[in-house]
A protein has these predicted regions:
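Short beta-strand->alpha-helix junction loop in the catalytic core
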Residues: 30-33, 59
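Short acidic active-site motifs
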Residues: 8, 37-38
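His-Asp phosphorelay/catalytic-motif detector in bacterial-type signaling
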Residues: 21-23
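Radical SAM enzyme [4Fe-4S]-AdoMet core and its adjacent flexible, acidic
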Residues: 10, 14, 19, 41-204
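A short, conserved beta-strand element in the Rossmann-like catalytic core
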Residues: 3-4
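Conserved hydrophobic beta-strand within the GNAT/NAT acetyltransferase core sheet
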Residues: 25-29, 91-93
Length: 204
């Protein structure tokens, strides 16, 4: 569901910008698709009232382990092209066992490339939505249903704090299923008065 794959993305962003010059535009991407000219044009359309979050989970030797099929050189060229035209870029780094040793190096690279921000993200992938319990690893799958990279949980300090609450929630509610049934869900898009387009094309 990467926005840059869609042939309508640039036209869509341009439409929003023409309709409302004060609207803040943003998107998340793995940055591996399209050419540098596409990214330069996106930066010009967005201007300073917008940003792109580039999901780079590691460096040249590790990013592809989670971002399957994504070419690192393309990621670097595309993000650099976006920044070169004044685009505001954020680097978001999901922490796994295989890349946790590269956080500081990636942070320095982001600074050198003039990213506006570098953020680490503690993933919630080490929780089984089927068994409703924590797990030590996450098996990656490709589009053909074949197993790919097995992702291992990072060190304790990099584990999503929400995963540590599992036992407390079970003790309080009896089960995770019951917790889901009685917990209120707050929509971030409503709270921030945003329009959010999902990978399936749903608009909220």
């Amino acid at each position: 569901g990467d926005p840059c794959i869609s042939s309508d993305s640039l036209n869509g962003f341009e439409y929003f910008r023409i309709e409302n010059n004060n609207m803040h535009l943003s998107m998340n991407t793995n940055g591996g698709a399209q050419d540098v000219e596409w990214w330069k044009e996106l930066a010009i359309i967005m201007g300073r009232k917008g940003h792109v979050t580039f999901s780079f989970d590691g460096l040249s030797d590790t990013n592809h382990l989670y971002r399957q099929g994504v070419n690192w050189e393309n990621c670097m060229k595309n993000s650099a092209a976006f920044i070169s035209k004044g685009g505001r870029a954020r680097w978001e780094f999901i922490i796994f066992d295989h890349n946790q040793h590269q956080i500081e190096e990636a942070k320095e690279l982001a600074k050198k490339m003039m990213f506006d921000d570098f953020r680490t993200k503690k993933t919630g992938r080490f929780f089984s939505t089927v068994k409703h319990e924590g797990k030590e690893s996450h098996q990656g799958m490709n589009r053909k249903g074949q197993e790919t990279q097995k992702l291992e949980k990072p060190k304790d300090k990099y584990i999503n704090s929400a995963l540590k609450k599992e036992k407390d929630l079970v003790n309080k509610y009896g089960s995770m299923d019951h917790y889901y049934d009685v917990t209120d869900i707050n929509c971030k898009s409503i709270e921030k008065s945003e329009i959010f387009v999902t990978a399936e094309g749903h608009v909220f």
